Amino acid sequence: MESRTTGPLTTETYDGPTVAFMILGAALVFFMVPGLGFLYSGLARRKSALALIWVVLMATLVGILQWYFWGYSLAFSKSAPNNKFIGNLDSFGFRNVYGKKFDEDAYPELAYATFQMMFSCVNLSIIAGATAERGRLLPHMVFLFILATIGYCPVTYWIWSPGGWAYQWGVLDWAGGGNIEILSAVSGFVYSWFLGKRNEKLLINFRPHNVSLVTLGTSILWFGWLLFNSASSLSPNLRSVYAFMNTCLSAITGGMTWCLLDYRSEKKWSTVGLCSGIISGLVAATPSSGCITLYGSLIQGIVAGVVCNFATKLKYYAKVDDAMDILAEHGVAGVIGLIFNALFGADWVIGMDGTTEHEGGWVTHNYKQMYKQIAYIAASIGYTAAVTAIICFVLGYIPGMRLRISEEAEEAGMDEDQIGEFAYDYVEVRRDYYLWGVDEDSQRSDVNHRVNNAHLAAERSSSGTNSSSDGNGEMIQSEKILPIHQEDPANR
C-alpha cells in the first residue's frame, strides 16, 4: 500500500518512500565531501595535509550558504520559462519551496532543493583541491561563493531546469558531467594557472605522503557516488538500479586499466594508480550511468582509464601545476561520459523511470545526438574558463584577496601558515635552524652522535630491548640522517 505523508505547511501529499530515497541520497552525496578531503590530503605532502581537509569542508559550508540564499533560485526557478540561461530570485532564501514544484511530483520541492544542494557542495569541494600547498584559504572561499553564483548556477540551469537551452535541446547529462565535472575541472585548472607553480626545489622526490588516506578517500567517494548517480532518478525505480550497476562497471574497468598502464611502465602495482583509475571511471559514469547500456559502461571505463592516464601529462605541456590532476580525472573523464551518451545512449534505458522519453544515441540510431553533446561540452568549457579567469583577475586587485601564500609560507607548509594546526603534530617543528649560528663542525658532531645512538638502539632492539636511551636518559630511535642544511622535502 502506498505510503503518504502530509506536509506541515501544505495540504499536498507526497510519496513517503520517494521522499526517504531523496533524503538518503542527499546524505550519502554529502558523505563524498570527507572522501574528497582524505583523497586530497593523502596526495599532498604532510605539511599541507590538514589544510586540504579544511578547505574541502569549508567549501561545503560556503556551498550550503550560497545555495540557501539564491543558488537554488538561480539554478531551478520555475517562473523563468523564457530565460534559457539562468533563473531568477523568486525562490530567494528557499521561499515557497515547501509544496510540489510540479503537479506530477511525488516529493516536496524542499526535498529536491536539498538533494541538489549537495551536488553544488561536491562541485565546490572538487575545485578546492586547486589550492593544494600554495593557495590562501580566505580568497578561495570568496572565489567559490562567486563562482557558485555566476558559474555553477547558470550551467546547472542550462541542463537540468526545464527552461534551460540544453534541457530543451535534448542534451543528455544524467548526474552532472557538464555542470559538475567539467565545470570543477576547468575552474580548478584556470585557478591553478593564476596561482602559479609550486616551488620546484621543494618538489624534489615528491610523492603522496599517505597512500592509505588516498585509498580511504577513494573508497568513501565510490560509496557516495553510487547514490550520487542512482538517486538522480529522484525515485527508487529500475533506472536508478541500472545507474547503480553502470557506475560500478565503469569504475572497475577504469581502475583495472589505469593500474595495468602503470604496471607496464613501472613494473609495480600502484595503489595510487588504482585509485586514480577508479575515480576516472566514476566520473565518466556521472553523466552517462542513467543513459547508456551496461556493456557501454564497460567500454567507457576502459577508455576513461587510458585517456585520463595520459591526460595527466597535459599539465606539463600547459605548464600549469594541477597538483590534484583535477583536469585529467574530472574534466577529461566528464567529456568521455558525455560523448558516450551519444554513442551508447539508448531510449529504452532512459525510459526505465517510466516518465522520460528520449531518442537516445547511436545505439538507437539517433545520430544527431553527437553534435548536441559536443556543443554542450564546448559551451561548458568556454563559459567556465571565462568566468573563472574574470573572477581571479578581479580578486587579484582587491586588497587582502591575494590568491597565493608567500614563498616562506609555502616552505613552512599550509598547515603551519594558514591553519596553525597539524595533521601529524608529533613534535615541535623548528624551521629556523639555519639561523642558529652553529658551526658545521658542531652540527657534524651532533649528527655522528645521533648515528651512534641509532646503531646502539638497533643493537639493543635485536637483543630483545624495545627502546634505548642516551647518556641523558632521552629516548632514541633510528632516524634518517641528511647532509647539513638539507631536509627531505618529500616528508615535510
UniProtKB/Swiss-Prot annotation:
Which of UniProt's keywords are assigned here? Ammonia transport, Membrane, Phosphoprotein, Transmembrane, Transmembrane helix, Transport
What Pfam families would the database entry show? Ammonium_transp
**InterPro entries named among the record's database cross-references:** Ammonium/urea_transptr, Ammonium_transpt, Ammonium_transpt_CS, NH4_transpt_AmtB-like_dom
| Chief location | membrane
Places the protein is found: Membrane
* Membrane protein topology class: Multi-pass membrane protein
UniProt keyword Transmembrane present? yes
Query: What is the stated purpose of this protein?
Result: Transporter for ammonium (both charged and uncharged NH3 and NH4) to use as a nitrogen source. Can also transport methylamine. The affinity of MEP1 is about twenty times lower than that of MEP2. MEP3 has the lowest affinity.
Q: What is this protein called?
A: Ammonium transporter MEP1
